[in-house]
């Protein structure tokens, strides 16, 4: 916990950053696309570097590293960026790497963010480049994210004479969450000033998505991904013999009622058109079959796509918990932890960028999708500056389905890698060429 002085100092620093950004003149909106010569240069460079980029992706897949432990991954990234002539900063937020590509022409700075960490999953794919690390796997596609960002850096560094501004490549650790007791991820990168020096005016990211076919991308304007909060509940009853339940207070029965009634928040307490998920994912209680349990512990997650709704959830949950426990004569302890806000793709920024995306990939390959209830800490960047995250299709064309994210069988089609690079290059160049970015708009301020 910060001291009062340290907290005040941090708040002043953030206020200065906010004022510095918002006092800059808003960049003019444009819906232009790149000229033919620049488009051809991107394609030539993509063809030239494609095999090396795929090689990097496979190396990363074979050598996954967990959150805040991405040591070798960071070394590889830093060495590649340095070889390209970028200004490289290592050890950001622990293992993070930041590469700054300065264009030859004056202009604003935009960023490309990629996450680096893997998951504690044993890979079950029979691939020549499957994970070599027992119990660790790139099952969420961060190996693709990293290789795509590196590929984008390769191409744009060769086109720096065309860059009307700068590109900051942010390679982030711990998107999946830092280990208990540690800081990490987007929050720590922002805290350490990754959006400063030079000030970043807009930021891009992508995430692989197995529901979409390789060669396509998916986008949503406005709220794109959900908030993510956790809750912890301990119900305290009174133990008794299983044959004499009237002498105890059954914590398991009470927990069952709580679990059931929490779902009435979604179905009865809130506007049914609002997307809300309340999931109890863990329950522990009891010691043997003939003893009334005196304690049950519950843990779960809450997801929303609306900031106002998110604010209401803890109170609605505790009202149900309190009422039921009192009616049983039990007690409880309830802890609600806010984790991530919803991820907001600013609509004006998205609309300004869509022509470039469609020009790069083709009109019918840029698909509007529904918001999803998964969460991403890229949302923290999107709270600060205009942001655009989109889905990159990785399902093999012709296949009706693919293994989902976080599956031991997750196997994205590598043909998506050049698609992601092409999309990122067009977005970044379009943002700098036509200065299609926005002054800072906080989604939170729009909700209040």
Q: Would you name each region that the model predicts?
A:
Residues 60, 99, 112, 142, ...:
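Divalent metal-coordination and catalytic microenvironments
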Residues 127-137, 144, 161-282, 287-291, ...:
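Histidine/acidic-residue-rich, glycine-tolerant segments that coordinate divalent metal ions
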Residues 34, 83, 256-448:
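Metal-dependent amide/peptide-bond hydrolase catalytic core
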Residues 14-26:
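Bacterial N-terminal signal peptides
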Residues 34-137, 147-164:
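Acidic/His- and Gly-rich active-site-bordering loop/insert found
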Residues 1-16:
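Bacterial N-terminal signal peptides that target proteins for export
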């Amino acid at each position: 916990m910060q001291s009062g002085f340290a907290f005040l100092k941090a708040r002043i620093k953030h206020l200065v950053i906010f004022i510095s950004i918002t006092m800059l003149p808003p960049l003019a909106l444009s819906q232009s696309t790149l000229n033919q010569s620049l488009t051809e240069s991107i394609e030539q460079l993509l063809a030239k570097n494609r095999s090396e980029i795929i090689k990097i992706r496979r190396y990363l897949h074979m050598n996954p590293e967990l959150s805040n432990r991405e040591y070798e991954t960071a070394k590889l990234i830093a060495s590649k960026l340095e070889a390209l002539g970028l200004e490289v900063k290592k050890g950001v937020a622990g293992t993070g790497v930041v590469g700054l590509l300065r264009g030859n022409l004056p202009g604003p700075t935009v960023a490309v963010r990629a996450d680096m960490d893997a998951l504690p999953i044993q890979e079950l794919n029979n691939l020549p480049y499957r994970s070599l690390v027992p119990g660790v796997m790139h099952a969420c596609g961060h190996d693709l994210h990293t290789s795509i960002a590196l590929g984008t850096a390769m191409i744009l560094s060769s086109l720096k004479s065309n860059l009307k501004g700068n590109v900051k490549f942010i390679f982030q650790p711990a998107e999946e969450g830092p280990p208990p007791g540690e800081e990490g991820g987007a929050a720590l990168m922002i805290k350490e000033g990754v959006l400063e020096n030079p000030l970043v005016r807009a930021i891009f990211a992508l995430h692989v998505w197995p529901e979409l076919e390789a060669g396509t991308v998916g986008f949503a304007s406005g709220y794109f991904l959900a908030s993510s909060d956790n809750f912890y509940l301990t119900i305290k009853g009174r133990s008794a013999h299983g044959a004499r339940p009237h002498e105890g207070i059954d914590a398991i029965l009470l927990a069952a009622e709580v679990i059931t009634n929490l779902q009435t928040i979604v179905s009865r307490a809130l506007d049914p058109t609002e997307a809300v998920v309340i999931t109890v994912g863990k329950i522990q209680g009891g010691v043997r079959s003939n003893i009334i349990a005196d304690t049950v512990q519950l843990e779960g997650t809450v997801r929303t796509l609306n900031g106002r709704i998110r604010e209401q959830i803890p109170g609605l949950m505790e009202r149900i918990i309190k009422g039921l426990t009192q009616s049983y004569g039990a007690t409880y302890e309830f802890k609600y932890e806010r984790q991530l806000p919803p991820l907001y793709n600013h609509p004006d920024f998205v609309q300004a960028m869509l022509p470039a995306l469609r020009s790069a990939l083709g009109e019918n390959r840029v698909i509007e999708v529904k918001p999803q209830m998964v969460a991403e800490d890229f949302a923290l960047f999107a709270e600060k500056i205009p942001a655009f995250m989109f889905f990159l299709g990785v399902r093999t064309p012709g296949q009706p389905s693919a293994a989902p994210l976080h599956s031991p069988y997750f196997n994205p089609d590598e043909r998506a890698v050049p698609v992601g690079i092409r999309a990122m290059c067009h977005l970044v160049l379009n943002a700098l060429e036509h200065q299609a970015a926005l002054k800072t708009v906080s989604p939170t301020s729009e909700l209040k």
